[in-house]
Amino acid sequence: MKEKNIEMQGTVIDTLPNTTFKVELENKHIVIAHISGKMRKNYIRILTGDKVTLELTPYDLSKGRIIFRSR
C-alpha cells in the first residue's frame, strides 16, 4: 500500500548546489527540497524568496520535493 505524501506551502530561503533548495515551511520548519522532474524538464526557474508547494513523505520530514512555484 502506497503512503500518501504531505503537501505544504513554504518560501525558498537559500539556493544549494544541484537544484536543491532550503525551504522554510509555514510552520517555521526548514527542509531541504529538490525540483520535481516535470519542473526540471520545463526549465522552471526557482529563486530565493519564491513561494513554493512541497511534497513531503511521512518517512522523512526533513526532505521534500518542490512540485509547484507560485507567482
Curated annotation (Swiss-Prot):
Q: The S1-like domain covers which part of the protein?
A: 1-71
Name its cellular compartments: Cytoplasm
Q: Which UniProt keywords apply?
A: Cytoplasm, Initiation factor, Protein biosynthesis, RNA-binding, rRNA-binding
Q: Name one Pfam family in it.
A: eIF-1a
Q: What GO CC annotations are associated with the protein?
A: cytosol
Q: What is its main location?
A: cytoplasm
Q: Which superkingdom does the taxonomy of this entry point to?
A: Bacteria
Q: Kindly state the subunit structure of this protein.
A: Component of the 30S ribosomal translation pre-initiation complex which assembles on the 30S ribosome in the order IF-2 and IF-3, IF-1 and N-formylmethionyl-tRNA(fMet); mRNA recruitment can occur at any time during PIC assembly.
Q: What does this protein do?
A: One of the essential components for the initiation of protein synthesis. Stabilizes the binding of IF-2 and IF-3 on the 30S subunit to which N-formylmethionyl-tRNA(fMet) subsequently binds. Helps modulate mRNA selection, yielding the 30S pre-initiation complex (PIC). Upon addition of the 50S ribosomal subunit IF-1, IF-2 and IF-3 are released leaving the mature 70S translation initiation complex.
Similarity-based family = Belongs to the IF-1 family.
What is the protein named?
A: Translation initiation factor IF-1
Please spell out the taxonomic lineage of the organism that makes this protein.
Bacteria, Pseudomonadati, Pseudomonadota, Gammaproteobacteria, Enterobacterales
Give the encoding gene's name.
infA
